[in-house]
Design a protein with these regions (language model features):
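C-terminal and inter-domain tail/linker signature
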Residues: 2-142
Length: 142
């Protein structure tokens, strides 16, 4: 089960958005639940792969993605109606890990735009390791 807590943050002083519930629905690949977080005309952009999705296309991309997933929210920042959520995502067998940075802009408590950036976790490139610069942020990545 994902290591997430239910977390509501206020938007504009009165409307709540449950960002942790949204991330949990995505990790569980629960299309009905995912849909409940979006405005009907929401736009979703995956910038790393130059893809723009409708809500229904986003749900297909997530729910038909192979495997079972887990993850945990590492950081959340809120600026007015914009949530920046950084999530560590990994397959249930923990054979790999990824980081997703999600910029979630809400309107009336629903996601109006979602801009996501995905990266594979891994070793620095050889040329940088050979320079012997930097150090690990954490000792264990997965």
């Amino acid at each position: 089960m994902p290591k997430l807590v239910r977390a509501n943050l206020t938007i504009g002083g009165n409307t709540m958005f449950d960002y942790a519930g949204f991330i949990n629905a995505v990790l569980q690949q629960d299309g009905t639940e995912i849909h409940s977080y979006f405005a009907d005309d929401a736009v979703i952009n995956w910038h790393c792969t130059n893809e723009c999705f409708t809500v229904d296309e986003y749900i297909i991309a997530n729910c038909e993605y192979p495997g079972k997933w887990d993850g945990e929210i590492e950081t959340v920042h809120q600026i007015d109606n914009l949530f920046v959520v950084i999530t560590k995502v990994y397959p249930k067998d923990r054979s790999a890990s990824f980081h997703c940075v999600s910029f979630i802009r809400c309107l009336n408590g629903k996601i109006a735009t979602l801009d996501e950036y995905w990266a594979d976790d891994g070793e620095p490139p050889k040329w940088r390791r050979e320079m012997k610069i930097g150090k690990p942020i954490t000792e264990v990545r997965i």
